[in-house]
A protein has these predicted regions:
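The conserved Walker
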Residues: 56-60
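N-terminal intrinsically disordered, low-complexity tails of helicases
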Residues: 1-50, 68, 114-115
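Walker A/P-loop NTP-binding motif
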Residues: 40-52, 63-83, 100, 105-110
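Short hydrophobic/aromatic beta-strand immediately N-terminal to the Walker A/P-loop
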Residues: 53-55, 90
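Conserved nucleic-acid-binding Ia/Ib motif block in the N-terminal RecA-like helicase ATPase lobe
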Residues: 22-25, 32, 79-119
Length: 119
């Protein structure tokens, strides 16, 4: 079993593999040309159906990583959420400030899906 802090090199043909169109659009608008190492690791684990725990520095892209990781589970084949959709995910943050930061990040990431985020 590899060490918990090991990083596997992953190569994808697309900048953000298996990312639904609304997210690709949001990422492009934010000038995300390629995933960070944390995002690559999360997307690879998601593609393999693995569970994971992620710990990385501030600014490493963790919020976008888990926002993308749950996207296909939440949306399925659709590109937008129904207007009357009830809550579908809960993300717990240890502080109010971090909860608000997560909300801001997911708000732009999910903008084109019709999703709402609250903190």
């Amino acid at each position: 079993m590899p060490a918990l802090n090991s990083v596997r090199k992953v190569t994808f043909k697309l900048p953000f593999p298996q990312t639904p169109a609304p997210f690709t659009r949001a990422l492009t608008e934010r000038k995300y040309d390629e995933p960070t190492p944390v995002q690559l690791a999360v997307l690879e684990a998601r593609a393999e159906g693995s569970d994971l725990v992620v710990s990385a520095q501030t600014g490493s892209g963790k919020t976008v990583a888990y926002g993308l990781a749950i996207a296909t589970t939440l949306l399925g084949e659709a590109e937008r959420f129904p207007q009357d959709a009830s809550p579908m995910a809960l993300i717990v943050a240890p502080t109010r400030e971090l909860a608000m930061q997560v909300e801001r990040e997911l708000e732009w990431l999910y903008h084109y899906t019709g999703a709402r985020s609250l903190s």
